[in-house]
């Protein structure tokens, strides 16, 4: 049986999503917790890997297991085996054809920047920081040029496994609320 689940995590203490030999990763924590509940080794596939220190509010992953557990048992069992910085938000059985990475229609990202002269002491790991005044209105206007299909080859890593770098940006916006500048982008 294949299951999909939504995971929220604070990436501050992790080397990123992907399993590493000598560093803690979100993937290794989730696989360990799921394996404890399933009573067998479990491997998870995610919709998109995150880098060191990056957080996720609803990372979708899938895994396969023949263990008979209710959704509630999967949820409670996993969350009791995860560190406080990682939580399963929901879980459901899905069709065998579901793939967290390749079935996804889009991904949304949010970048938050504290824009003030003094570096923040609280919540610093959840924000970028820029001491120079950002013009969020002009940033928003300029960002609209990214709407639609574009080739983002220049932003790919050397080992990128995607077949192409053409992405369709369906939404992008920049807004300010006090000292916080938020950039949101949704693309395929």
Model-assigned labels for residue ranges:
Residues 1-188:
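Structured-RNA-binding interfaces characteristic of tRNA pseudouridine synthases
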């Amino acid at each position: 049986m294949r299951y999909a689940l939504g995971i929220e995590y604070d990436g501050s203490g992790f080397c990123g999503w992907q399993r590493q030999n000598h560093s803690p990763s979100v993937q290794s924590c989730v696989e360990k917790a799921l394996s404890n509940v399933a009573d067998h080794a479990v491997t998870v596939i995610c919709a998109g890997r995150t880098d060191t220190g990056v957080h996720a509010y609803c990372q979708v992953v899938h895994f396969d297991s023949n263990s008979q557990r209710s959704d509630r048992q999967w949820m409670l069992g996993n969350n009791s085996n995860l560190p406080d910085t990682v939580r399963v938000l929901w879980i459901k059985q899905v069709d065998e054809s579901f793939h967290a990475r390749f079935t996804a229609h889009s991904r949304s990202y949010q970048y938050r920047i504290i824009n003030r002269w003094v570096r923040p002491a609280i919540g610093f790991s959840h924000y970028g920081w820029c001491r120079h005044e950002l013009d969020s209105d002009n940033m928003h206007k300029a960002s609209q040029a990214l709407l639609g299909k574009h080739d983002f080859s220049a932003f790919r890593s050397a080992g990128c496994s995607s077949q192409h770098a053409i992405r369709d940006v369906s939404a992008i916006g920049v807004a300010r609320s006090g000292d916080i500048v938020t950039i949101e982008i949704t693309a395929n």
